[in-house]
């Protein structure tokens, strides 16, 4: 069924404006039949952040910003779904056009600007689907016009703790002016201290909801040293590596679109984000698991991310070019690799290549 859907939908959606195509895809998923997915190979099961994942392949934040279709995505075979980014108040985001396909590069540039319907609407949707279970994380951010951005994160932690499987503290989007400044050492330490304190305040009523930190791939290694040190000292439960990049490789072929302002994702981000996964893994020293994201478009790419240090992986941009059937393809490739190498679980290879990757020349 998924293959047939991709065969029909991908060519049609490619003719539409990228944002209109995305909106149509969300509407289509809301109509997806309630068919249970095929059971995952038991070897793909992963335990991380105190949660049990049936497989390691998740969909990254940005696809289902407003929690409109998390259950359809789970039925398509994702091991987990991350909704958002959600802000306390609704906001329209940046003016259109703000989403661009770089088709020859299998990449996307976006400058969306945290457009979302706000915490109240997303909370209502998550409450309505809570009975169905599944791992649904909530990616949280600050409103562009907020007078106290840290207070925005705290409010969202307190609001969503009863319903979120985990939180992602997003301080790495390049499309909200000044947001990435929260990755600087003093600001990040204050933010994480207040976020973890908020989580502890609601623990009795909401449980121990894991808190993850999502970082940019454009950090220097010195900045990464500080970020990982603070994340460890504040006892975050994990990190997501990495968000979109502001850099533009000279190898990009879409020479006009490559100059659009915004964050670049997709295949050109793969080498940089994988290097950052490995660098983070080495610095974390097993203190917490990582989710690797950036340019994953095949089972081989997912395996490379895992061997670099990712316990779980996420994808989004590749769906634009490969379709929803990519999820099952990646899982099949991972299961086949475990069978071929006589391994019982992916945990046996997490970070196996990190020392080698961190010794390589920096990717351009």
Curated annotation (Swiss-Prot):
Cofactor: FMN
Annotated active site: 173 (nucleophile)
Cofactor stoichiometry and binding remark: Binds 1 FMN per subunit.
CDD domains per UniProt: DHOD_2_like
Principal EC category: oxidoreductase
Subunit structure: Monomer.
UniProt xrefs under NCBIfam families: PRK05286.1-2 (NF003645), PRK05286.2-5 (NF003652), pyrD_sub2 (TIGR01036)
Protein name per UniProt: Dihydroorotate dehydrogenase (quinone)
Organism: Rhodopseudomonas palustris (strain ATCC BAA-98 / CGA009)
């Amino acid at each position: 069924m998924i293959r047939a859907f991709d065969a029909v939908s991908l060519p049609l959606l490619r003719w539409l404006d990228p944002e209109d195509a995305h909106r149509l895809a969300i509407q289509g998923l809301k109509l997806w039949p309630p068919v249970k997915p095929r059971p995952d190979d038991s070897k793909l099961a992963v335990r991380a952040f105190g949660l049990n994942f049936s497989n390691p392949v998740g969909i990254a934040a940005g696809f289902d910003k407003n929690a409109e279709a998390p259950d359809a995505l789970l039925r398509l075979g994702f091991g987990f779904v991350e909704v958002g980014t959600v802000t306390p108040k609704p906001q329209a985001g940046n003016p259109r056009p703000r989403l661009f396909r770089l088709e020859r590069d299998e990449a996307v540039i976006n400058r969306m600007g945290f457009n979302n319907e706000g915490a109240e609407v997303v909370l209502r949707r998550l409450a309505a689907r809570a009975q169905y279970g599944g791992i649904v994380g909530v990616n949280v951010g600050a409103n562009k016009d907020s007078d106290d951005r840290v207070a925005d994160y705290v409010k969202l932690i307190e609001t969503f703790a009863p319903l979120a499987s985990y939180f992602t503290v997003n301080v790495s989007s390049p499309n909200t002016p000044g947001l990435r400044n929260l990755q600087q050492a003093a600001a990040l330490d204050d933010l994480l201290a207040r976020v973890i304190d908020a989580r502890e305040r609601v623990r009795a009523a909401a449980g121990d909801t894991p808190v993850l930190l999502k970082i940019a791939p454009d950090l220097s290694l010195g900045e990464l040293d500080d970020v990982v040190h603070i994340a460890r000292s504040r006892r975050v439960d994990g990190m997501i590596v990495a968000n979109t990049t502001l850099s533009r490789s000279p190898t990009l072929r879409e020479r006009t679109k490559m100059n659009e302002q915004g964050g670049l994702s997709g295949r050109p981000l793969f080498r940089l984000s994988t290097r950052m996964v490995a660098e983070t893994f080495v610095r974390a020293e097993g203190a917490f698991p990582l989710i690797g994201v950036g340019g994953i478009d095949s089972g081989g790419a997912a395996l490379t991310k895992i061997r670099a240090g990712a316990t779980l992986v996420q994808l989004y941009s590749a769906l634009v070019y490969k379709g929803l059937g990519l999820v099952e393809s990646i899982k099949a490739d991972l299961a086949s690799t475990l069978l071929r190498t006589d391994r019982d679980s992916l945990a046996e290879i997490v970070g196996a290549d990190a020392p080698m990757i961190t010794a390589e020349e920096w990717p351009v």
